[in-house]
Amino acid sequence: MNIGWFSTGRDEAARQLLQAARDKVRSGNINGKISFVFSNREPGEAKESDLFFELVRSYNIPLVCLSHKRFKTTKEEDLGIKKEWRIKYHREVNKRIEPFAPDLCILAGYMLIVNEELCQKYDMINLHPAPPGGPTGSWQEVIWALIENEADTAGAMMHLVTPELDRGPVVSYCLFSIKGELFAKYWRKDDKNILFRLIRQHELAREFPLITLTLQSLSRGEVSIKNGKIIDAQGKLISGYNLSCKVDEEVKKNLK
């Protein structure tokens, strides 16, 4: 499986995630390779992304860059319209990544909204920090919505990137209870900030394992993407591949 990796490379987490995926490729857990890394920043724009680029090069992975900021300043005025700008920008991105023929692209800390053409041409997946059917928005908005709705479970999902933000078909997901003994006393408090932080801590601990296990499952054919539908190993249509148990095992290993 040829994997295209999209990342702005804006922080340490971006480097850690790439390292985690690359380690899984090298160990044979992910049956494939990272064919290229694309970034919407270019060398010299920011210290953190420069560190990210150094890591990519150290892995001998082809690095493709197109600065969205510089693209804005070098194109005509009508690119001030966000939708038109995204279309033209991502058409240029496509020209640069097309030769790599990725089977799958993952948005791993990519801070731009992908235009419709690109996400229809390639199977692209993204992480959303909520259970399937859960709240949309940022991770902060998701957690406050879970608390407000007195939800029983939290989690995260990997979904297909579609024009409808955070609502593409669910590829995989993991769930965990937020009503057990660990959480109970914080639900009873008027100040829900500790509960908020606790839910975030447990959700965040599951993000990297969910991402790498999803890539592993896709590379092994345990779950597949066919014409925008999610299929299991028997060829049956499913509403997402439940990786909760495997993710929990990874979380326990990482805590040791």
Predicted regions and their residues:
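One-carbon transfer enzymes
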Residues: 1-256
